[in-house]
Amino acid sequence: MATRAESEVRVTILFGILQQLMTTRQNKLFANLSITSSQFGLLMHFTHNPIRSWLVSELAKVMEMNQPGITKVVTQLVDKGLLLATPDTSDGRKKHLKITDKGLKTCSKTMNFFEPDIQNIYSSFANDELSELEQRLEKLMTWLDTNRDDIKGL
């Protein structure tokens, strides 16, 4: 039987492998679309609360990207009409960003495109196994989100 430390290392290795396998799958799927995985990831962030506007600096923080990187993706999405950029009334350098109806539809169409592969990935899981996996991943996601700066060894 593995020790807790051995299990923690193994789970971390498995997450690395899963991340690579899922990234490869996503890249193959996105090759057929007019939007990139980075654009989709950012656009999906807006779908959680479509009426909220965001500043680039806020997005950079929550998406854990540098400001030039997020600005590039935002510009691409604005150019495609998927985000709307409205200048700040007190500081014209700042732009308030909101998802457009076209952006919401693009997210929905993209998720529909992914649905067959998503179902394929989890087809070998019983409903209770999938529910348990979801609960455990939610717990891990919440911990990682809450403890973004609590990195031991730095």
Each predicted region: which residue ranges?
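Recognition helices and adjacent regulatory flanks at domain boundaries
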Residues: M1-A2, E8-V9, Q19-L21, E58, ...
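N-terminal leader segment of winged-helix/HTH proteins
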Residues: M1-L33, K80
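C-terminal regulatory/oligomerization modules of transcriptional regulators
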Residues: M1-T3, N127-L154
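Charged, amphipathic alpha-helical coiled-coil/dimerization segments
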Residues: T23, T75-Q135
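N-terminal helix-turn-helix DNA-binding core of bacterial DNA-binding proteins
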Residues: R25-N66
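Short, hydrophobic-biased segments on the C-terminal half of alpha helices
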Residues: V56, V74-T75
